From Swiss-Prot:
Annotated substrate binding sites: N187, P188, P189, Y190
Family annotation (HAMAP family): RF_methyltr_PrmC
Disulphides: none
Protein name, per record: Release factor glutamine methyltransferase
Species per Swiss-Prot/TrEMBL record: Chloroflexus aurantiacus (strain ATCC 29366 / DSM 635 / J-10-fl)
Gene it is expressed from: prmC
Residues annotated for S-adenosyl-L-methionine binding in this entry: G121, T122, G123, S124, G125, D144, N187
Length: 283
């Protein structure tokens, strides 16, 4: 069987469960062959060995059962990084890159070093690592309540040789932080489990997804802690579900009445990030 035949066969199996059936198939075959996806696309007439064909078919069967591609191949690209992921962590999403972009922009306000940032619910470490790679003078805390998630984050932190600038802390939301920080950033659980995609529900960790009956449980607790864990001129940036902006802004204004607040939209035009910048300064 040639690569072209294998891909076409896989597409027929995946098209009913994945809108990116061709991409999925090409990524999975690239993983089997140890090639780049570009080489798979270019070498359409290459003949697979029986062993390669069998391994590919096994992965396609798992993908047809809605297992995410990132778990099948063991990594995910995020903000130009190649991150190790498995079922212990939520798979980093493209829309979360906006959270990184806005945090990098916010960091430009601060001219002291080290800039101290806390990534609450760090998971795979994606946000913390992306920030550290672009902010060489920052100290970043990656906090997670899940020791399993922190084990994955540690692999990625070490891969990018950031052990000296990213400190991983186990605990609930802000409680492990040793002192107030300049920037709090978080992509907290904000989904209602009964409303999420079947494949996500079956395979990704519920601890990283479940936002409670209205999706706002973590926001309430995290934002309530912000006055304690933010420095007087600090900022908080939060990823949100597309219908949650007004509720989260309300929580921020209650907790930080002196703060400026704002909402940013993603490329699809959906509300995606809510932020607050604390204007209260101690003289």
């Amino acid at each position: 069987m040639t690569i072209q035949q294998a891909i076409q066969h896989a597409i027929t199996q995946l098209r009913t469960i994945s809108p990116t059936a061709r991409l999925d198939a090409e990524l999975l075959l690239a993983h089997i062959l140890g090639w780049s996806r570009a080489k798979v696309v270019a070498e359409r007439d290459h003949v697979l060995t029986p062993e390669q064909e069998m391994a590919f078919n096994a992965l396609i069967e798992r993908r047809a059962n809605r297992e995410p591609v990132a778990y099948l191949i063991g990594h995910r690209e995020f903000f130009g990084l190649d991150l190790f992921v498995d079922r212990r962590v939520l798979i980093p999403r493209p829309e979360t890159e906006l959270l990184v972009e806005l945090t990098l922009k916010e960091a430009q306000r601060f001219n002291h070093t080290p800039l101290i940032i806390a990534d609450i619910g760090t998971g795979s470490g994606a946000i913390a690592i992306a920030l550290a790679m672009h902010l060489p003078h920052a100290l970043i805390y990656g906090v997670d309540i899940s020791p399993d998630a922190l084990a994955v984050a540690a692999i990625n932190v070490t891969r990018y040789r950031l052990d000296d600038r990213i400190r991983l802390l186990e605990g609930d939301l802000c409680t492990p932080l040793p002192a107030p920080v300049d920037i709090l950033v978080s992509n907290p659980p904000y989904t209602i489990l009964t409303e999420i995609d079947e494949g996500v529900y079956r395979h990704e960790p519920h601890l990283a997804l479940d936002g409670g009956s209205d999706g706002l449980d973590c926001y309430r607790r995290l934002i309530a802690a912000a006055p304690t864990y933010l420095k007087p001129n600090g900022a908080i940036l939060l990823e949100i579900g597309s219908t949650q902006a007004a509720s989260v802004v309300h929580l921020l204004r209650q907790a930080l009445p002196m703060a400026e607040t704002g909402i940013e939209r993603d490329l699809a035009g959906h509300d995606r990030i809510v932020w607050a910048r604390n204007r209260y300064v101690i003289h």
